[in-house]
């Protein structure tokens, strides 16, 4: 569950800091360390929705011949090819609120260099299936179907980061938002770029 995941993140970081301090090092969890040859690191959060009564995956189309036929008739770039109502609305909510969520999921000035010029990091609020340049990825199938959010950085407050993403997904469900088609472009061309600075992210959060 989300709260346990946040608790474990705090315990992990505290444990790493203490172990490295004893060895004479400092663990900062900074996204882009200022060392030659260093690469940026992110904190990817995987979202799963399940039915409370029996634990079935709630992301995909509902079971049944009609649902299977509808999914097969969808274009591969359509979210409905992979996701049912709950999953599609959740995905759309994460996209709509991505710019404001950045302030809580990437709360350091350092983090915003990661959103530029790298095919392995997101640059704009788009989703894809097998696209490691997209902000959101729909991964897995069947009971393992889930949404990967690649917005965050490792030093984010996990309680705020996770809560903001849950709120965004629930808002997408409440308003029955629909996501745009998937993208295969690694540079995220054609969609609004993610905030370039923490100040931009804070402005987006205030307007969200």
Language-model regions, residue ranges each:
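Active-site acidic/histidine clusters and adjacent loop/turn architecture
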Residues: 1-11
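Glycine-/small-residue-rich active-site loops that bind phosphorylated ligands and cofactors
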Residues: 4, 35, 154
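Catalytic-core signal marking the mid-to-C-terminal active-site face
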Residues: 11-21, 25-27, 50-57, 63-208
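Histidine-centered divalent-metal-coordination microenvironment in nucleic-acid enzymes
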Residues: 30-55
